[in-house]
Every structure is written in C-alpha cells, then in structure tokens.
C-alpha cells in the first residue's frame, strides 16, 4: 500500500494509525504485515517528496518523527534490510531516495556511545603513536589486555577509506556495537555494506584481497577475511559464508585444515631425506643474519620516521591502525615516505619442532598457530609491546635478530640456557644457532608421528579458546581433529543436518566437497541464499533449501550416480519441514538459467529443461508473487531422471544399504566411505527405534492437524470476507436503486422538454411561412394598385382639353407619318394597316378583362388561406389543453413517486434521529453534569467510579511502558484525566501514587492533583486533574503569545509558576527526573476551582492550609507526570530504577552516563525549559535532536537568542552547567534578579549606592577608587562557554544624560552629577525614586504656567505617578543596568551584610 503525502499529513505523522488503517483496508492481521515496513515506506516517500514540497519545506516534523522511529529497537535491522533489498533489486530507481534517507542515519545519535567511556590513555598508547617513546609497561592490567584484540579490529576498520559511510556512522561506538552491526549485515545479506565496511573489493589496488589455496607455494590469506571470522558468532555462520564466498572465490581452498595449520608437517615428511641439506642451508642463513640485521635496522629507522609523520598527519583524534601483522618481504614495500599508513612487518615463522627459515611470509592463522615467532628486522618498541600482549595471551615465544633489541626469552633453547646466549658475540650466536638447529632437526627425526599429532592437537586446543564462540575458534577446533575440509565447511554453514544420532551429514557424501564448492561458486548463489527467514542452527534451517536444490542439481551437472540423488531426496523426506518449503520465482528462474548453461545437462536432460522452463514461464505469468513448492520441483526433476522416491519404504534401511561395505562401485564416491569415521551402530539404532516407534505417524498427524487449523482459519476469513462483500453489494444496490428512482423523473422532464422544443420549432416554421405568404400578397396588391393608376391616367387623358387633344392629334399624326414611312420600308399593303388599327382597341379590352379575373382569383385564394389559418388556430386551441393535461398528469405521477421516496427517506431519517435522541436522552444526565459526553459503544469502559472511552479520539497522551491517558468522568460528575498503567510496572505505579497523594495533601497550586485510584486484572487507573494543553503544544501550534495575553501574567510570572512547582517538589525531597515541555500543562481558574470543589470529599486536605493556595490564578502552568520521580527519606539523592533515556535533550550529563541523580537534574531540565519558554520553542543545545546529546556531552551551549536579556542568560547558563556542583539550587533560582519585584530592585539600588559611598569614604579621594571605576566598564558574559571575563569597553557608549530626560527629572534639584560615572547614575535614579512626588508637583506647576504644555512634560508627568513606572522608565532606557550592578557587586556580597539577601 503506497501512502500519499496528504495522508501522512492527515494522520499528523502518526505511523501507528497509518499502519492500523493499512491492516483494516487489506484485512490483514498483525502477524501478516510488519509495522516497520509501513514506517519505512512512509519515510522513503517523505524523503522523496519533502525537498520539493513548498508547503512543508522545513520538514522539522518529519525529522522528529524519523528519529522517534530510529530510537526504537528494530532500527538497525530494518535499515540494513531495506538498504540491501533496494540496492540489489532496483538500484537505478531508488538509490537517490535512500541516499537522502541514509544521510540522515549518518548523523543519528541512536547508538551514541561516549568516546570518553574508553580509556583515552589506552587509545593513545596502543593505537596513536605520536612518538616512539610511548612505552607500555609489562605489568599491564588484565582488563587492558583482554580488550586489545577487539579494539585492534575496530580501529583497523574505522581507518579504512572505503568504508567512510559506516565508519562515520560508528565513530563513537564500541566493539560490541560493531559485532552487532556485522550480525545484522550477515542476517540480511547486506553485501554492499559488508564490502564497504570490510574492504572487500576486487578493483581496489591498494587493499586487494589475496586468498589462495593453502599449499606449500603460496600461504597468503586476507586479514579482513579472518577478522570477519573473529567477530562472527556461530549463529550467523551461513550468511557470513555467503558474503565471503561471493567476494573471495578461492576461500574454500584456503580454509585451514590440519595439514595447512600445523604446518609444514607433510612437507617435512616428504623431505626427510634432505634434512642435512636443509640444516646446511639453515646454518648459512643464520650466518648471514648479521648482515641482514644492519640493513633491517636502517629500514626500521625509516619505518619509525614514517610512523611519526603519519601520526602527525592524522592528529585529529581519529584512531589509526598504524600496522598490521601481515607482510611480504619485497623491495617495493620498503618503508619510504610514499608508503601507505599501514606499516607491514615482515617476519618468519618457526616451529619449535621443525625449523624452517626459507619462508618469506606467513598467513594470519599460522601466526597464531605457531609456537614462536622470529623477526628478520628490528621491531618497533610500540609494536613489540603489543606483541608482548599476544605472547602473554597465547604463550608464544618471540625473538628478534636485531642487535638493538632482544626479547629476554631465548628462542633457541626451550630449557634454561637461553639468556646467556643472547649476550655473546655474533660468532657465538651463529654457533649456538647452528647447534640448536641441529638439535631441533634431530629431535624432529626422532619423534614419532603419534607424538607429533598429540602435541599439535594440544597446541590447537589452546587456540580454540581464542574468541570463543566465533567462527575462528571453530576453524581451529575442527582443523585439529578432522582431516577433511568438508567438516569445516559444514561447521561454517551450520549444516549439522538432522539429529546426529541417526542421520548422517550431507557433506560426507562427496569427496573433498566438490559439489557444494561448485554451488557456492556459482554466479547465481547470491540470489538463492537470500532467505528472509532466519533460525539458529539448533532449529530447522529454511536457509538450507537453496543449498539442497543446488546440490541436487550439481549432481546432474557432474554426472553422478542417481543413487546419490535418492539420498538427497531421502534426506528431505526425513526433514519434512524443509521438504515443504518454497522458493521464490526469481530463485526458480536462476535454477533454470543455471541448468541451461550446463552443456552436459542440456544434452542428456533436454526434456527436463523444457518442462522446468515451461513451469517457470507459467508461474511467472499467472502468479509471479507466489512461491514455488520445493517438493513439486524435486518431483519434476526426479520423474525425468527416473530416480524413485522412497515414500512407503523404510528410509533408514535404504541409507543403511548405502553404507554397507558390500556396496562397491568404482564410479561412485561412496566407495571411499569405509575409510571415514562412520558410526554404523548409530544408524542401526535409528532404524530399530524408528521401527518400534510411530514417530513418522505422529509427525504426519501433527501436520494434518496444522493443515486443518489453517484451513479452518482460511474458511473463517473467507466467510467473513464474503459477508462483508455481501453487505457492501447490498449497500451498492440500494444506492443504485435510489439513483435510478431519482433519475426517472429527471428523464421524463428531459423528454417533455424535448417535445416542447420540437413544438416551438414547428410553430416558428409556420409563422415564417405565413410571413412569406403575407409578403407575396402585399406584392400582388402593389401590382394591382399600379395597374389601377395606369387606368386612371388613361381616363384622365381622355378627359383632357381640346388643345391637349389637338396636340395629341398632332403627335399622333407625326407618329402615323413615321409609321407610314416604316410601313413603306417594310412594303406593307394598306389593307393590312387598317386591320392592325382595328385590332388595337380589342386587345386592350381583353387585357383589362384578364387582369380583373386574376385579381379576383387572388382575393379568393387569400380568403381561403385566411379560413385555413383560422381553422388551424382553432384546432391548436383545442389540442393545447389536451397536451397540458397529459403533461400535468405525468408531472403529478412523478411528484407522487418523489413524495413516496421522500417519505421513505424521512422515515429512515426519523429512525436515525430517534436512535440519536435515545442516545442523547440516555446521556442527558452526563451532559448536565459534565463538560463532554462519553459514547457508550464497544470501547466504553466503566471501572469503579471512572467512566471513559478507549477510542483514539479520546486519548490525551501516551507514555512509556504502554501508559495511556484518557479523557473521562469521575463519579458521573467531574471531568478528569484517567491514566491507565500496566500492573507489570507496579514499582512505578506505587511511586507515582505515593508522590501524588503527598502533594495533594499539601495543596500545591502548581502540581497536578490526585483524585482517585481504581484497578482491574491488568491495569491500574489513576484519576488526575484534567488540564488543557501542554507547553509543547502551545509552542508548536503558535498559541503561546495568545495564552500569555489571556493569562494576565507576564512571561517571568509564568516561568515562576513552573519554578514554584519544582520548589515544592524539592522542599518535600522529591526529584521529578523527567521535566520537559510535554510535562508542563496549562490550567484555567474556573476548571481548577470546579474540580477541586467537587472532589473535596475524596481528596484529603490540610485544615491548616491557606485559602490562597487552593486557588490558581488564571491560565497558570502546572507540573505533571511524576512516574519517574523519587520520594527521598535520608538524602536528596535519587536512585530510580527506570532511568530516563535523555533522548529529548532535557537531561544532563550524569543522566546520560547513568550516574546517580540529584536535585540538580531538575535544575538542568528547568533551565532548558526556561530557554524554551523565553525563545518560543528553541533549545540551548540546538534544535536538531541529532546533536543535542552530543552537545550536552561536550557542553556546547548557544544562548545568543537571549542576548538582549542578560539576566535570563546568566540564570540559564548557570542552570545548564555541565558541572552539577555549579548549578544553583531552586531557592537560588527564585532569588535571581530575573524574578525580583520592584521593591527588591529599589532596595538593591540603595545597597549599591551605599557601597559606592563607603568606597568613596575609604578611598580618601573624590571617587577615584577602583570599585567606582570598575562600575564604568562592561562585564561580558560568554554565550557559548563558561569563561567570563571583564573587558575594557565602557558600560555606556555615551554619557547617561543623553539617554534620559535629565532636564525635567532634575527640576528643583541642586545636586551635581558626573554624567560619565555610573555611581552618579545610581544616585540620580535613587533620588528620582525617593523625590518623585515633589518632582511631579513642580512639573504640574510648569504645565499650568504654559498655555500649551509640551509632550515631554506630559510624558514625564505620567512616568512620575509611582515607583513602578519610574523604575520601568530607567530600565527601558538602560536595559542591563540591574545585571551590570549584580555582577559587579557579587564580589562584595560576603563583605556587606545588606548584600547577603540578594545573593543567597
């Protein structure tokens, strides 16, 4: 489930609520999903979102939530697991996100171990060689010797450049934390971190791993590998081996066996005939030792110089590993200036029985297995001191050929004749050496092999005790008693398979462990080994499943006999829990790919490969997230190979048959088994026992019962899910029906609207047609009118006068002449012309008659059209009411249906309202008696007189050890805070109840009050005063200023509330031990008074107490959470068992160092709280919680935010001092000038003036004494350290007459003042305060004389009303005057009696 940034903000970064919501949504139980994975998903998402989110750019809330999560117990395992998974699977996508996440881890203080816990002298003497004269005495304590190897390992790792991430992270850790880290790396297969931490890189040229077979030619092994074996416990052996083998392919060949560890045993046996030549060579070599020593001395001097240079370069406090006990005598590794910081010391190894001088180097194991060491160079003194520890620890003899230095124990003679030989000349030394060599060789030739074996085993038994419980001890022990490397691998991997009484080891089936070596060297092994489950070797090991699969497949690749495959399958049948295991699809794919790469398998078993590939593709497509069963995989392979599985036969009989001596097959590795130490009697005992007992049947029954239980659980879950789904489906159907019912009337309305729109469109079309017709009629009428006009014109022409007629006749005659001329041109006959003339009037009459007829027809058409329109209108009028009726009927039906639905909904609502009314009626009494309602649902709790609800919305706070605080009611009347605590922590509960009862009886106004106590089987419930919010809530939500304004108090008065509460605790010998802003609560007057008045019958009170103590002022602070407090009887020291962790940064050094705690612990916490209050949420040791503890340990304080208020700085700086003896008592805190009232400040000014007068009188001069001069100079307090010193800067940068209104305030005064002297300023302030009434009277007279008084006079007149306003005026003009006088007069507090009350 992916979480959005908005969801995280909604839950206010409460990851537990998010996790619960996740489980509910997915129907998961707590065992099926991990809370840690939910948190890590949220944190990674926030790392990606917050840097780009403008709304939440600060990310302070995220950082606080992150480190709260980091402080939980599973942090390191989770981070390493997530880092390994993300980097191996999706490195390209998620590396950037996790880099941001891991960068925060590097700065974390969760595993902080103080560097000062280690003995700094030991560190400097052993690991930081600042000069060659740092000697370690031979009589060191045993404790220093025991921790040498551990510190040697961790320092050699921390100095590694390639592991900078982890080395910075674990800079201040101890050796045990490093082992824990390595265990987690092994557990979660975090190979990347392992490479960085232990320098396992192929590409590194400087620190390249050199691991080769332990043969006679090359005996080199990496120190890093053996160091891993040193710090690895047996339980985590298999993951360690996977990491080692992945990075060192030849590691299996270099595992020490008896032949490789005790040396040169077989070499000497093979070369018995050449002993004389060896002795001669040895003598020659010994004769040349003197020459070699001279050269080596020069080299060693250079080496010492280089060591000094390296130490000077690395003098920043980092522990550097200057040397490592491995080396190679090559010229390129001379100790020149360019050589690395690792100074390798070449040495030779000598066995007391077999003298060997031809070897030039030795591996790490032979160094510890040899009984003596001789160096062919001069040994550095500091290096020799460390080797001396090895000699003491393991009993080795060490010798150097150097002339300058020789170890007191002579190497050449094991008896008592060694000391004298060391003092002889070089020739004598050579002779003695030759004699000793000859004696040793003779002894070697004369000793029997059996005695050699016994001595060798005795020496190895000594080494088994080195780092007991680690893999290196197992290597030593198994190499001493067995001959085969398979035993060591078996032990390293923890594969002591089955019960050793009747089951054999798989490793004994193969010669020299070839098959398992092949599978471990496979390039796919790293994925197959990644099993998330982990169990110790004594339990069933699910991590063996991939090994068994590959071992079985390797049999095929090596073309082994199928009988061996039967043995593997029988082993799985005997260990059925392993057989029923599963592998992931990725592992299955790796198996298929591995088989494809094997040519022999591809040739012989192609059908099996195709089937496996088909199964893999099928599973990958359909169910890629589901694992694949092991038994199915083995069954498929086995059927194709025709290797039967013994299901119904006796398993042990088949195994016994395999071990019989008669079974001989030259091609089978079983032929060598008779030579091995196989106990056949144990196998036969197992056979008889299995025949007599029904052990397998019992196992089958148990498995069947488990299956039935799991099936039942699954069925129950299915039924529950089905019920939930049915309910959801029903709800969905009801919602759909409702929507449909609402949609039907809407659809009808839409349909009606469509019909109306269509009718409107038709009407519009008809209107348009009518308009067109009307236009046509108008055109016709116009034409008729024109014709009529023409006719009228003709008639008028006929009626014209004779003149006009004559004119017309003349015109006509002209026309006729023209016509005649035309006729002539056309050659027309005269009769034709006459006919034309006669036809003209007839044509005219015909035209007129035709026009009349057309006009009549048009009129008739218009009449018909009008009649049709009338008829249509009538029809429409008749149809409209019918349509309206239909629509109205439809609307009525819809309204009826809607009303029915509304009535149904109303009924449902009424039922809900009735239920709610019933609830309200049932809780009316609670409503009337209390300020809030408790809903009686599933989470409702009623215990004794307490009633509350366990819903999360009703939780007021959470504490340690599962403590919860609920909002509830006591006696059905009084609202209280109910604190639920587990009975498993009875000491704390009794302690808190005892403290609360005593405080309640004493009636403290600034402490939370105890009301009542109830308990049940599991919990104890305490009723406490119900408060509003905490100081932390006010600050974080920006409501502190609002609270101060509404309280009617100043900031100093509110701070005094907290101090009064602490004073009350200390006066009754109670140390709170856990003061922080969360435990400072707010309480209003009304609420407190009501609660106190109603609970008087239950609470015991003192009859002699004052009435004022029962009433709190408006919005005061009170102290709560006394779960960690301690009632003191004999002294003021607190020895609580449940010590605070100090993670919030409100505990001093002594708490972090688990020392005894006194009242000064509360003083330190109170100082941090006062700084928090005065600066609105800041911390004196930094706001970043990562570095608070670090800054507290180093006393890095920053009070610059209070630079304007030097009194507060002075008080807080003394309260948070690193030295508890320098912190003030609570009475001294209350007596500090920061909390003085006006009267006490005026008294202090009078006392200062008296001292100035006495100093003048004693000095004999006119104010020239040292004290009065010192008043003029500034006294500076350092805001970041404890060092305070006076400076030569003047207290005032200008004369004080320019700072105050001297003219108006000195009216009527005849005194003279020096404005550059502070003593005169004190005298002026004192005179103004004493004579302020006279000064005010004179100023008022001036105002009366002036017609318009100035603003300055009015202001001064207002100031002189009382002493408070006057002192406030001077403090505003000269802010730090009281602080300056307080610090200057502190030296004289013991000399003058009237000053004692101001400083005690």
Curated annotation (Swiss-Prot):
Please list the residue ranges that the record marks as compositionally biased, kind Basic residues.
707-717
Q: Which residues form the active site?
A: 1074 (proton acceptor)
Q: CDD domains, per this entry?
A: RNase_Ire1_like (cd10321)
Q: Which GO terms describe its molecular function?
A: ATP binding; protein serine kinase activity; protein serine/threonine kinase activity; RNA endonuclease activity; unfolded protein binding
One GO biological process term: IRE1-mediated unfolded protein response
Question: Which keywords describe this protein according to UniProt?
Answer: ATP-binding, Coiled coil, Kinase, Nucleotide-binding, Serine/threonine-protein kinase, Transferase
Residues at which ATP binds = 956-964, 979
Q: Which GO terms describe its cellular component?
A: IRE1-TRAF2-ASK1 complex
Reactions catalysed, semicolon-separated, are:
L-seryl-[protein] + ATP = O-phospho-L-seryl-[protein] + ADP + H(+); L-threonyl-[protein] + ATP = O-phospho-L-threonyl-[protein] + ADP + H(+)
The secretion signal range is none
Q: Which residues form a coiled coil?
A: 689-801, 842-933
The Protein kinase domain covers which part of the protein? Answer: 950-1235
Name listed for the protein in its UniProt record: Probable serine/threonine-protein kinase irlF
Native species: Dictyostelium discoideum (Social amoeba)
Instruction: Report the gene name.
Output: irlF-1
